[in-house]
């Protein structure tokens, strides 16, 4: 999960200060940025300090129990720290699908907003009475909305769709976000150009299911995402384009060809596979089989040897036998996945999987997670050792979270916030964050690489070197 306090921005009103906390995924962060943009446009002022805020907006995640527990912890903290008469507004997925879990805090909450109702943030904080507005619609249907970026200046997320057509047995997202609603091409192009004109160097396309983009706008069975990529890549400018959240059967041959041929489209995909055993995949109501997954991975790595693949898997799905888990462990051990997120199955109410027999004990799930983590760590160690001595082009992100004596950087195989990074311990040549430099890899630290800047990039454009 990602926890992000949105930064301070200039405004003209000093007594109407707002403080945002955005929990969960990058899609939630974009929603928070839209709400922040609406309030700044109305004349409110953002503050980094909870104690200074007149309005505290908590944008929640509800995908897993752990995410809901995090939101409750933040509510307790806000209640303890906020100044007298400051109002708390809770929005996001938790209000849409788990409002009952907020009952113990309702006397402290001024307003509830559904995850699709962010355009009502102004009326929520200005309401004299406590209340709520919760629906499954989306501000995407409104067209253009204000937005205040909160990410570092050199990268930003671009949400191209809301909702999901899939019905995975373990997932509550469709019930929260509703049906698929894609932004029209002209709206996306307008937002894209705004980002490029702001000198954003890395634009990350996101949706609940990016590969389904446009399928609600057209009866054409060809990939609408591929068409969108072609249009975006026609745009002039110095930028990288990254894709997150795709199903393996949605990555067309044309998209693969673009990754290989166009230096602006990063050879990186985030594909949540969830499992590899056919019976489990069927029980999960996934759309691909083991054979299809392996065929896709083989084709992708053959056509784009330098590609980096991120994925996620679930351990302890109801009925998962030791043999079926071992099949997953063997698959992970083969090293197909570069960056892996491993999740314990969470029994979510009102999902088909919650009603399945043979729910797996927590201790067994935790043991299986530990085994997969150890396997993936060996894969990462083996790969990272091959990179020692290599000079890799990377973007300088920020200071290291633990000390300003170190910097963090990322090369094309590392997405912000979810993947490991490069820890830079020698950076005399760096003049600003967002700059692209060549970094010599000198060592490793856990999942991260360690290196020193040896020279600046000449044309500030990505050079796609082969993977080690």
Curated annotation (Swiss-Prot):
Q: Which SMART domains match?
A: Elp3
Task: List the Gene Ontology MF annotations in alphabetical order.
Answer: 4 iron, 4 sulfur cluster binding; aspartic acid methylthiotransferase activity; metal ion binding; protein methylthiotransferase activity
| Disulfide bonds, paired cysteine numbers | none
UniProt cross-references to Pfam families, sorted A to Z: Radical_SAM, TRAM_2, UPF0004
Q: What is its EC number?
A: 2.8.4.4
Q: Which domain of life is it from?
A: Bacteria
Q: Which cofactor does it need?
A: [4Fe-4S] cluster
Query: Domain Radical SAM core: where?
Result: 150-382
UniProt-recorded name of the protein:
Ribosomal protein uS12 methylthiotransferase RimO
Q: Which gene encodes it?
A: rimO
